Amino acid sequence: MAKIKIAEYREVPEGDMRKFDAKGVPIAVYKLSGQIYATSDICTYDGCFLDENHRMHNYMVECTLHNEQWDIRTGEVVIPPASEKLKVYKTEVIDDDIYVDVV
């Protein structure tokens, strides 16, 4: 895995997410209770970008087009119609910079 600086910690609002690009890969970065999480930004049900069509429910991200939800900690589907989990990326904060491990 390659660790890439993707954002500054302050760029991600608490309780929400922002989309960043990591070597051409759209990544959704979330901040909840000060912790940073990252998943693919692409809905596994219809391929839209989650950052453009989402609502947060604690550790769940909902795609508002079809109301499916995933747990951002594991990528697991919590509410269908999606059946495929979101890809989850390992994150690390170093000196207020957010790093994500991408392939």
Please provide the spans of the model-predicted regions.
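Rieske [2Fe-2S] iron-sulfur-binding domain
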Residues: M17-V103
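Zn-dependent metallo-beta-lactamase
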Residues: M1-D21
